[in-house]
Amino acid sequence: SVIELGKMIVQLTNKTPASYVSYGCFCGGGDRGKPKDATDRCCFVHSCCYDTLPDCSPKTDQYKYKWENGEIICENSTSCKKRICECDKAVAICLRENLKTYNKKYKIYPNILCRGEPDKC
């Protein structure tokens, strides 16, 4: 769920989840146009990951994970929860790897400015 995702973001980036709400064209919803930078592309890929889970509820299904030696370990009994956790883990890692591309001008970015054909997942 968004709760676990938020915790992962804090643990891996030391940024608050609010830093990514309405960031660019894909972080925190919107999902249109082209990603603005590598950080926004992380969210695009995350959205694509969620698209592969049509029978799951990634925003509301809570799951369990461990934080061990600076690493996220997904531990769930159900397939849906494990896959949601893996999607969230991947975006948190991606955001950490692309912290240098984070640009404040894309925070609370107007969705109307997100134009162009979206990339394919």
From Swiss-Prot:
Write out the coiled-coil annotation as residue ranges.
none
- Intracellular or extracellular location(s): Secreted
Keyword list (alphabetical) reads: Disulfide bond, Myotoxin, Secreted, Toxin
Tissues with expression: Expressed by the venom gland.
Q: Where is this region: Important for membrane-damaging activities in eukaryotes and bacteria?
A: 104-116
Per its UniProt record, what PROSITE patterns does this chain match? PA2_ASP, PA2_HIS
* Gene3D superfamilies to which the protein is assigned, alphabetical: Phospholipase A2 domain (1.20.90.10)
GO terms for biological process? arachidonate secretion; lipid catabolic process; negative regulation of T cell proliferation; phospholipid metabolic process
Principal location listed in the UniProt entry? secreted
* MF term (GO), any: toxin activity
Q: What does this protein do?
A: Snake venom phospholipase A2 homolog that lacks enzymatic activity. Shows high myotoxin activities and displays edema-inducing activities. Has cytotoxic activities against HUVEC cells (LC(50)=4.9 uL) and human lung adenocarcinoma A549 cells (LC(50)=3.5 uL).
Q: What else is known?
A: Negative results: does not show antimicrobial activity against E.coli and S.aureus and does not produce appreciable hemolysis on human erythrocytes.
| Name this protein carries in UniProt | Phospholipase A2 homolog ECO_00035
The organism of origin for this protein: Echis coloratus
- Lineage of the species this protein comes from: Eukaryota, Metazoa, Chordata, Craniata, Vertebrata
